[in-house]
Amino acid sequence: MKNNEDKMESVLKTKKLNDQERKKALIVDDETDICYLLSNILKQKNIQTVFAGSLAEADKVLQSSGYFYYVFLDNHLPDGLGINQIKRWKQKFPSTHVIMITAHDSYEERRKASNDGADDFIAKPFSKEIIWKSIVPTSA
């Protein structure tokens, strides 16, 4: 386990990521249909996905699986608001791209997400083109 921690720390310090590390996404959403839809869209760009249905599950996945290049984060989850995790996750994993995806789109939520470090904010429903635009600068 120490080797994984050392590797993750090295990756975060250098921010020089290999192709494999750029191709991992964590999808945090309690709606299974959304998880599968996002996963299918991301697979078209060769991005591997892992699902978490709650914030607690996402924390466990982040602790055990290490680095994810993308985190697609729903806001309204069974155990809290995803938007409240952005700052903490960005502090711990500064080069992870956090992309909020929520049906509850408001100016206040967009502003808070942006101020806390979200890299993008996407309203549901979304199209694959919108998802691709959110990852193109980093997946090319």
Give, region by region, the residue ranges found by the protein language model.
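Non-catalytic signal-transmission and effector/linker regions of two-component phosphorelay proteins
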Residues: M1-K24, E129-A140
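Short amphipathic alpha-helix used as the core "switch/output" element in two-component signaling
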Residues: I83-S95
